């Protein structure tokens, strides 16, 4: 199995690349979805979150977590955010490992898995699982304009961007960088070129040449 960790800042086009690779036959795993999955009713992660942030977050009848209330408490300050991540991340990482070691990817042809990683620095201990780290790169100013075009408030964009790994960090940890400073057709061409080059190499590990 050829595993790609796909990263990029907010409004960089990361999800567009993930969808494009999925259309070409890659098995797609979105870590945002995994972060929601580990907080399903009855999970150990929910128990730990409730112990840290308040039992009143959990519905006593359904066991469902009030995610909105959790967000308000956990993202109120950096210390609370770090506490939530310290609880969630081990569960997310274990779930990812189980999925990568399972048979899901083997049902695709070629046997390629793309893992959409919102915060690459939080997954740094697991970069050894990736054959390639593919980073979608786009200037902050361009991303800000794109986010505005989708209806996002500028202050909200800047707040979210500040919480993410820096562009310098992403470039430093990238095996390959996809430039997305142009339009959709430019990005599509770069994705096609990347896919074709990996097919030609028979999906050999890019990091080791």
PLM features per residue range, with description:
Residues 36-111:
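ATP-dependent small-molecule kinase phosphotransfer cores
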Residues 24, 53, 129-130, 172-174:
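Short, structured coil segments at secondary-structure junctions
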Residues 28, 130-135, 177-178:
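Short, well-ordered beta-strand core segments
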Residues 95-96, 122-128, 145, 149-209:
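Small-molecule kinase domains that catalyze NTP-dependent phosphoryl transfer to phosphate-bearing small molecules
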Residues 20, 24, 46-50, 93, ...:
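An amphipathic alpha-helix signature
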Residues 32, 84, 114, 178, ...:
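Residue-level signal for inorganic ion chemistry
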